[in-house]
Amino acid sequence: MCTAAVYKTKDFYFGRNLDYEFPYGEEVTITPRNYPFSFRFQGEMKKHYAMIGMAHVADDYPLYYDAINEKGLGMAGLNFVGNAVYGEPVLGKEERTAGEKKTGMAEGHEIEAEIDNVAQFELPLWLLGQCASVKEARVLLSRINITNTPFNEKYPVSQLHWMIADRKETIVVEAVADGLHVYDNPVGVLANNPPFPQQMFRLNDYRSLSPRQPENSFVPGLELTAYSRGMGAMGLPGDLSSASRFVRAAFVRGNSISGDSEAESVSQFFHILHSVEQQRGCC
């Protein structure tokens, strides 16, 4: 059960809560620039951007939960159980122009045009290795086929959706039964289920909430007092379900303010993430 968020002052911050009851061996992992990777369908990527994030390293391969590259493009995968649907590899080149290639975003790396088969676990490396921005990631996503190829027998395919962001824009990527969808994300947060459009629609239920104190409109002539700070946000969900965490994170992140210094910004960003953290045993 996870929640991801972005935050921007004079700098850009990308982070997430990874709330599990037990660890999966994840650790801070740095992938140096141009460290060679072999993809199941795309061959070897010899040139790519450096990145840092949380990963479980298996067979010298970083299985990233989340990461950000040297250009400031961040990406996080969150559980999307019951909704994520990946495709079989699209083999053959019958529909491609013979010899047609397109150059990837990282200098010197070429990828074939039209359809790129990329295993689900390879997606962070595929995008963060080549793309300097969300705009560039959209280009690769427009021709990608995320496949249901497992890393190995020990690590089966994970059901995920992803938030991808730079300092200018944020998107959500969901592979579901009717295909791959890329959504603009104006609230800069993501949780788990339900699918992103439903999460966004549910925000309509909370349109009256505010960080300001509420006006008394209960009954004409009846004097009522706002006896505590924060009463403008009464009704903001506080349970640990993913739908409620999405609403709470969107509200807190969207109304948070801090100074522009690094210390102030980092502190406030951790406060945002702490607002939706989960305590062991509570769910």
Residues covered by each model-derived region:
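Aromatic/basic-lined ligand-recognition segments
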Residues: 170-179, 184-186
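Alpha/propeptide regions of enzymes that mature by internal proteolysis
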Residues: 77, 93-102, 106-147, 240-279
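A contiguous strand-loop segment
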Residues: 1-115, 148
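Short, glycine/acidic-rich beta->alpha junctions
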Residues: 60, 119-120, 156
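Short, flexible loop/turn elements at secondary-structure junctions
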Residues: 18, 79, 166-168, 177
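C-terminus-biased signal that marks the final domain/tail of proteins
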Residues: 1-13, 27, 49, 149-151, ...
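Aromatic- and glycine-enriched pocket-lining scaffold segments that form the walls
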Residues: 134, 138-174
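Histidine- and/or cysteine-centered catalytic micro-motif in compact active-site loops
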Residues: 80, 176-178, 252-254
